[in-house]
Amino acid sequence: SRGLGDVYKRQQKVKSQYEENPYPRWRFIRFFREYKISIKDAINYEITPNRINTNVNNKQLKVLIAGCGTGKQILQALKYENSVITAIDLSLSSLAYAKRKLDELGIHNVELVQMDILEIGLLGKSFDIIECGGVLHHMDNPSRGLELLLGVLKKNGFLKLGLYSELARKEIVTARNYI
């Protein structure tokens, strides 16, 4: 059984990695333009050929990006009509990079917060949409991270989750071994 000290050590190791090497580093986004799309249309586009039929009205949508890194993912979330975005990350260096890039693009309506997913309840908010890609697998207990995210997801909300897998990375590993 692993103790809290082990969990803390892993958190610190991940935090240290991204403090030293904010990820992903990006200089510009080719053809970036802010456009708006309804959440229903955005989700239907992403899950094609499947479809959702929801009555998302014109209420303001609260969006959480859990593990926003250097902010590139934030640009994609800006497409949601009538939305307010909160983006969290463990790494202050990554958040500083995100802030700098968003400022360069004239984007000032995103709340950036340094926070571990394990502390997500401290925000005191619930969200209509939660995006978390490439993050949970870094946690000592990914299931606990998912449970906490689901705890701040509103009823009938949407969770966009991305995990790394050995199968999905097989070609990358093969290419690296070849090089």
What are these regions (language model features)?
Residues 3-8:
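Short, small-residue-biased leader/transition segments that mark boundaries at the very start
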Residues 20, 25, 30-61, 76:
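Conserved alpha-helix/loop element of class I SAM-dependent methyltransferases that forms part
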